[in-house]
């Protein structure tokens, strides 16, 4: 098995640390370059990072010397670069890496809306990576080098939302109305400034800046299609699918919970048992490709009346699986359910790792 060289941008931040933790144990990738701000550049990683993961900093990464986030040095030897950069700096930096011919998998929001950039939840729409694959094949067939490209990871709460929607749409047809109320973990806000302890203890904050808009439009791009030329993405039009989101920050460390109600466009609607069976039988494409991190069970349907719960269910399939419970009829729409996903695994860094595994399986990197 060939091992690919990986770089991490924003390596000292919350998402960057999670990338490092996942990569350090990965049989198919090895960390070759770490990038952070000029304040950290030139230092050993163990001296540059304020490590805040529950697992200790892996010994193999402690003495790696941090570089600035520029496409030079060890970064130029990487097969894939993972970006955990904040959105306020990610745009220009990620663009420079793509222009240098590197494959970038980004957790930042900057390029998610671009028509030719895949926005991917790897257990939901890995087929959108085909747009990048086609570009790479065309360039190579003309005698050129593999071009650089960027693939965006979805917003963390979007990942949990679309996971059960994908198999339902495939089985029962379009969903024309959808509401979700999220209960989002504090880790989703990062380390600094993050969420103040005084704000979140004994409290719920009923506002997360920009989050509701992301949920509403990202869902339509992820569940949407590709144009006839296979070059751009075509989101589901507002006239065909209305999405309404309310987002709340809650005093939970990891795990985003979402209360979803939905209506199918086709009549008659399926039964509750039909919905449960559909979700249980869903196998994501990453599993079929044999990807290392792909969940054995993509969606865990829980029949207990008080599940899923973050503390009990967020780590199913090492955080790559999604749990769905309380599936029942809805008096306003068709069905309602509760969904739980691990926001820093399948909702962030883990999604990036699984995307890279798909790229490797398809020989794109």
UniProtKB/Swiss-Prot annotation:
Gene3D superfamilies reported in the protein's UniProt record: Dihydrodipicolinate Reductase, domain 2, NAD(P)-binding Rossmann-like Domain
Subcellular location, record wording: Cytoplasm, Cytosol; Nucleus
Known EC number: 1.2.1.11
Coarse class of the protein's main subcellular location: cytoplasm
PROSITE patterns for this protein: ASD
GO biological process, one term: lysine biosynthetic process via diaminopimelate
Keywords of the record: Amino-acid biosynthesis, Cytoplasm, Methionine biosynthesis, NADP, Nucleotide-binding, Nucleus, Oxidoreductase, Threonine biosynthesis
CDD domains, per the entry: ASADH_C_arch_fung_like (cd18130), ScASADH_like_N (cd02315)
Keyword Cell division in annotation: no
InterPro entries (UniProt xref): ASADH-related, Asp-semialdehyde_DH_CS, Asp_semi-ald_DH_pep-lack, NAD(P)-bd_dom_sf, Semialdehyde_DH_NAD-bd, Semialdhyde_DH_dimer_dom
One annotated Gene Ontology cellular component of this protein: cytosol
Residues at the active site: 156 (acyl-thioester intermediate), 256 (proton acceptor)
NCBIfam families attached to this UniProt entry: asd_EA, PRK08664.1
Function: Catalyzes the NADPH-dependent formation of L-aspartate 4-semialdehyde (L-ASA) by the reductive dephosphorylation of 4-phospho-L-aspartate. Mediates the second step in the biosynthesis of amino acids that derive from aspartate (the aspartate family of amino acids), including methioinine and threonine, the latter of which is a precursor to isoleucine.
Family: Belongs to the aspartate-semialdehyde dehydrogenase family.
UniProt subunit comment: Homotetramer; dimer of dimers.
Protein name according to UniProt: Aspartate-semialdehyde dehydrogenase
